């Protein structure tokens, strides 16, 4: 009887290990779409990995990207990757500007440091400039509400407080209904940092990393 119980226990442990092994690939595959689109022998973009290392403050980055068309990629660190949206009109400090944000594939955390030119023939070929970067806080958490960034993302309503070089204050990403699965709206929320009198894209075109503009980066 004792031997039978020991065997049963061993089988349970083995089944548990197999189950854990089966579940693990789903987590490892989060960046599969990102990697499958790129030839890392030709592009300097980081191959990257999921990075769930606990940081004191989560990061964000906005990268100006002149690919098939000019746009701004807004990326938020959530669950070890950069959740990403392409914003054709870019960010604004005016709360009345509701800009389309098209969700794209998850990027590795290392991508927040990437600035350079993606070679011709590669996915997203063209110059990429770090337009702004910094840290952010979960606005709901700041208000004392118990809802995680991952849950806000799943619910299609993200509210964050950005602390960047150019952008500061509360911003929202809201998933739209009836406009397509990957379409969101990105906008400045009303607070003391809102400013409807300026066009931040035109007044601050330079990279916060190198000081270059998208045109000078292309020439280099």
Predicted regions: what they are:
Residues 1-3:
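N-terminal secretory signal peptides that target proteins for export/translocation
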Residues 5-13:
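Sec-dependent signal peptide hydrophobic core
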Residues 14-22:
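Hydrophobic alpha-helical membrane-insertion segments, chiefly the h-region
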Residues 22-220:
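A charge-rich, low-complexity, intrinsically flexible signal that marks solvent-exposed coils, linkers
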């Amino acid at each position: 009887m004792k031997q039978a119980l020991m065997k049963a226990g061993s089988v349970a442990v083995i089944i548990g290990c197999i189950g854990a092994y089966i579940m693990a690939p789903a987590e490892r595959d989060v960046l599969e779409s990102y990697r499958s689109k790129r030839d890392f022998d030709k592009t300097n973009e980081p191959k990257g990995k999921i990075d769930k290392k606990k940081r004191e403050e989560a990061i964000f980055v906005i990268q100006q990207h002149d690919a098939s068309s000019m746009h701004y990629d807004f990326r938020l660190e959530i669950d070890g990757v950069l959740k990403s949206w392409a914003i054709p009109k870019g960010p604004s400090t005016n709360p009345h500007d509701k800009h389309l944000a098209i969700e794209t594939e998850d990027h590795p955390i290392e991508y927040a440091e990437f600035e350079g030119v993606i070679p011709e023939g590669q996915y997203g070929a063209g110059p990429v400039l770090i337009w702004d970067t910094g840290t952010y806080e979960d606005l709901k958490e700041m208000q004392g509400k118990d809802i995680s960034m991952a849950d806000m993302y799943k619910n299609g309503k993200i509210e964050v407080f950005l602390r960047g070089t150019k952008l500061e204050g509360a911003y929202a990403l809201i998933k739209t209904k009836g406009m397509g699965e990957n379409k969101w709206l990105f906008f400045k929320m009303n607070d003391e940092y809102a400013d409807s009198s300026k066009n931040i894209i035109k007044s601050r075109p330079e990279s916060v990393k190198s000081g270059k503009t998208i045109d000078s980066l292309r020439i280099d």
